[in-house]
Amino acid sequence: MEFEHTQVFNFEGALRGMRNPLNSWHKSDSATWVDCDMDDEYYDEMIYDTGRSYFNDVEMPATEEEQDALDEAIADKQNYLMDQARMATTWGEHATVRNVIGPNDMKLAKRLIAGGGEHRKFLRQIFVSVDITAPLYWWKEFDTYKVGTTANSTSTMHKLASTPITLDCFETDDYNDMVDIFNNPSPMEYPLHDFISCPDGLLDMLESLRVKYNETKDKRYWKELIRWLPNGWLQTRTVTMNYENLRNMYHQRKNHKLTEWHSFCEWVEECLPYSAEFITDKA
C-alpha cells in the first residue's frame, strides 16, 4: 500500500471562517505565507515568535530550574511548529504554502472540535489530495465513505489487459503462503498453493486469459479475466477528502483487523499537518 503526492489545502481559509460566527478575526494569530525556496530568516523568526506566544500567560520563573523548564517547553513548541510548517502544500516547482497555527486559534479550534460535528465545520474546509495504491478489498471498505470524498481511479476495465499480470500487481505486504488449513487438535501448517494453486496457478490462468484476449480480441476472454480477478489486485486512485472525513475514518478504523487501515492511520499521523490536534486527538 502506498501514499504519494499528499497535498493539504486551505488552512488559512478554514481558520478565518472558524472565527466568522463571533466576528473575532482580530484575535487570529496564525501565520500563512508562500515560501519560494528563499533562505530567509524571517520565516524562522515568525515560527519561533509564534512558539513563544503560547507561553505569554505563564508567570515569570522564580528559580533557575523553572526557567530551564520553561525554555525547554518553548523550544519543544517551536520545534513542533517548525516540523508542521515543513509539511506543506507545494504549488509548482519552487513555491510552498506554509501554515503555523497560533495559540489563540488553536484554543478555539480545539473547543469547536470538542463541541462535535455541528461546531467543527472548519475541518470540512481543510482539504487533502493524495494518490493511494491499495488492493480492491480495501477500496470496497473505503467506498463506504461517500460524503465529502471524491476518487479518480486507474481503469481496470480499460487497462487490465495492457500489461503482464504478475505477483507485483497484487497486495503482498503481509502475504504468507503457510496457513493453518485444518481445524483439529494438532493443527499443522501446509503450503496454501498445495490446495488451491495459489498464487502461481492463478497468475498463470489470468495471464493466459490476458494474452488470449490480446491475440483474438474476443471479449469472452476479457470477461473471464474480470470475473476471476482477485480482490488483492492493486488499484491507484487520486482521492480528495477533508479533515472531517479523515477524523471519522481514523477513529472508526484505527483498530480494524485489516492491516491496510493501520497503514492509512499511520499516513494520517505522519503526513498531515496538525493531525494530532485536529484528527487523532493525540496532542
PLM regions: where:
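Family-specific signature for flavin-dependent thymidylate synthase
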Residues: 1-283
